[in-house]
Amino acid sequence: MNFDQLTDEQKQQLYLQHLQQQQQLQQQQQQLQQQQHQLQQQQQSYHLQQQQAAYQQQNQAQLQQDDSYMDEDTSELINQPPVQLDHGSPIRQQPQMSAFMPSPRFAQSESFDNHLNVDPNNTERFTSMDSMNFQPPASTFTQLGNGSSTNLSEISSGQNSLLSNHSVNNLPTALTSDTSPPVQQHPQFQPQQQQQQQQPQQQQIFQQQQQQQQQQQQPQQSRAVVNQSVSTEAANSDMTGSNTKYVYFERKPNLLSKTTQDKAASIKLTLENYYTSSVSHAIERNQRRLELENKIANEDIGSSEERKNRQLQNLGKKESQFLRLKRTKLALEDFHTVKVIGKGAFGEVRLVQKKDTGKIYAMKTLLKSEMFNKDQLAHVKAERDVLAGSDSPWIVALYYSFQDSQYLYLIMEFLPGGDLMTMLIRWEVFTEDITRFYIAECVLAIEAIHKLGFIHRDIKPDNILIDNRGHVKLSDFGLSTGFHKTHDSNYYNKLLEKEPSNTHLQPNQLTSGRNSVMVDAIHLTMSNRQTMQTWRKSRRLMAYSTVGTPDYIAPEIFIHQGYGQECDWWSLGAIMFECLIGWPPFCSENPHDTYRKILNWQESFQIPEDVHLSPEAEDLIKRFLTSAENRIGRYGGAEEIKQHPFFRGVDWDSIRDVQAPFVPRLSSMTDTRHFPTDDLASVPDNPAMSKAMEQRELDAKNGGGRKNPKEDLPFIGYTYSRFDYLTRKNAL
């Protein structure tokens, strides 16, 4: 096995397996050594008793045979307990004493034994623990914990003389006693004198080895302790080896470079998004399985088991196909641009055709740099989440989303009927029946958004699209919010360490941000229909510009006093007013007056006397354009609005199946006659868009993307693929 070819994960697993084997082996050695030590104590006690009895019998026999032994009084020596004996005692020289004291074999034991018989002229001795008082150490193996600074390579290569306490205490030792009286040795103990002479040499060598070990461990232990707050008890436990060793680390990310911190944050968000999306996909997959099983269970009893199993197998194939196709990376080069059908401050909308399948889509392109500079990160994330989380027929469908170094791409369904603003420019005023139809469908569309937990906050005729059958769908969720942390600008300000932006709008403040509600001054007279038509065309151009449209925004959004879903109903009331009367309720000659009128709606709002409305229509408009506390739909939601008399006779369940007042006539699937593409010629190109396109081409040639990982943090997890569309035949 080539170690260099292994991955980091395999290396880590191999290291952990090796470490576990070493720990198990050390535990087995510890148990074996403890058993040997217990047996050793028992045998030592037994042999010591036998040797003491034999020694007493021999002395008594010598005293009876030779009176020369009586020159010294040995009765006191014989009566002493067998502890703390001097090195010259015959008991210390018995071969049985050392036969049951094997030392445990460690990594350095062989090299240690090789140095035992050196320097025979050295007579220096050292004292050790007496065998009768010997206690086994608490830890009989070299522990490699977090607190140990021992290097495994040093142990295996023999560079460090590391011995456990047990191996030290089990070495043959002798006690010296300069004051003990000399005792004449029996002739049978003479052969053991050579071993007695070698023991002081062994003791000296061991003492030197122990000193070297302590000197080597001191700098290693000082390097292992990182945190100065380690307690004295923990330090003592490290010296004795009786407790588990720990190393305390203090996190100091500020000491790292800014690039390293950005990379760490990018990895953190990537992992968070990966596991979050994995769990979400697993839940959706299980939900689809349960829905199919419930559908099969509710079918006729006569359905065969083969048919049911075939349906389950087809679902499994779709799931496998989805996982494969989901890993297919899309790029701008996979699409052919047919025509640009919309422009804005942060990007544009194109009619595109996928090269391999020929399918037609609407591609919304957003410039990343403008998202940063104009503080639109939260808005673009909210828009993507709304489109990805919805399968409602009232919301434009999102099929794919992807990104490159410069742009974000949203691949959506193409709605060839244009938008409601185009219809207002063409027809000027709607009848109450036509208004009832479109307002009723808008109620259902806004209800679908609210059920997803989002607030649109930018309901206006430009964002109400018409499909090929003439029915309504909502789009452009750039100002929507789901009250999620990623839909809050402060989240990205903290992520990117930016100063919080001041989003409070002032009457005399003109800004180019998406939150802006200011428009260019337009001089008009309310009684002049021709001037109103000019205003509408100018309004269309403002939709392409960097300024927003304040005419449909609720007053509570301006003053930042807190708002809820009821702010969308205010916008719907303003649209209803424009459909029946011909202009927005707070339209003024300049943006400052529009702003002031909305804030002072109690004095500025009025229905023209020359316009005749039904009492039901007038009442509904007034209940829409009122304070948030009294606004219709605040407490009862869409159901409360559906019960209003103005919608009497509306079939809410099948309204999408009825004939629409206007059905677009199309000559081809790429027909864009209902989009004001001619007006786009007068809209100048955004210099940032041109610069970004050049940078994108340069990045493609160099084979790389953004060099700063910090700029990619807000866009992690932006890629999306829809299951029900991707699993269709030839979806890609």
UniProtKB/Swiss-Prot annotation:
Q: Which residues form a coiled coil?
A: 281-310
Any one GO MF annotation of this record: protein serine kinase activity
The chain positions of domain Protein kinase read 335-647
Residues of the active site are: 458 (proton acceptor)
Q: Which reaction does it catalyse?
A: L-seryl-[protein] + ATP = O-phospho-L-seryl-[protein] + ADP + H(+); L-threonyl-[protein] + ATP = O-phospho-L-threonyl-[protein] + ADP + H(+)
Q: Which InterPro entries match?
A: AGC-kinase_C (IPR000961), Kinase-like_dom_sf (IPR011009), Prot_kinase_dom (IPR000719), Protein_kinase_ATP_BS (IPR017441), Rho-assoc_Ser/Thr_Kinase (IPR050839), Ser/Thr_kinase_AS (IPR008271)
Q: Which stretches make up the AGC-kinase C-terminal domain?
A: 648-730
Q: Where in the cell is it found?
A: Bud neck; Cell tip
Where does the record place the region Disordered? 111-240
Single biological process term from Gene Ontology: filamentous growth of a population of unicellular organisms in response to starvation
Q: How does it assemble?
A: Interacts with MOB2 and BCR1.
Role of this protein: Serine/threonine-protein kinase required for wild-type hyphal growth and transcriptional regulation of cell-wall-associated genes. Involved in the biofilm formation through phosphorylation of the master regulator of biofilm formation BCR1.
Specify the protein name.
Serine/threonine-protein kinase CBK1
Provide the gene name from the record: CBK1
